[in-house]
Amino acid sequence: MKVKKGEIYLADLSDASGSEQGKVRPVLIIQNNRGNKYSPTTIVACLSSKIYAKHHLPTHCILPDGLGLKYRSMVMCEQIRVIDKSRLFKKIATLNKRQMAIIDKKIKISLDLRLHNPKK
């Protein structure tokens, strides 16, 4: 299956444990396209439609309406996992570059990645 960074798919995550996100749900592909091209797995961030029931974290990104999702949803950039591409079964939408730039910032917050600018 060919997938690209920024695409949203339905995925079967039914083997979740504890506080992991499970069941069939939308996920956002966050792995780079080189990895997506050559690997049988991909890296995803889970989406949730419970945007008002959850505590808002700096790693959450509410998605705009009109993407084809059944409910208004948010990307939970703290809920990242590697999945086999066979778990993906329906493409729903593709985020634009501006939206993905926001997601990338939220992932950096989640993983505590800081840009390092060495002095010249």
Predicted regions and their residues:
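Conserved functional hotspots at enzyme active or ligand-binding sites that engage polyanionic ligands
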Residues: M1-K120
